[in-house]
């Protein structure tokens, strides 16, 4: 996903 906290939810 994206960089940051969003990436944790969109691996």
Swiss-Prot record:
Top-level taxon:
Eukaryota
Which positions carry Threonine amide? 11
Q: What are the entry keywords?
A: Amidation, Neuropeptide, Secreted
Query: Could you tell me in which tissues this protein is expressed?
Result: Expressed in abdominal perisympathetic organs and abdominal ganglia.
Q: Where found in the cell?
A: Secreted
| Protein family (similarity comment) | Belongs to the periviscerokinin family.
What exactly does this protein do? Mediates visceral muscle contractile activity (myotropic activity).
Name under which the protein is recorded: Periviscerokinin-1
> Lineage in the entry?
Eukaryota, Metazoa, Ecdysozoa, Arthropoda, Hexapoda
């Amino acid at each position: 996903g994206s960089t940051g906290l969003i990436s944790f939810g969109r691996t």
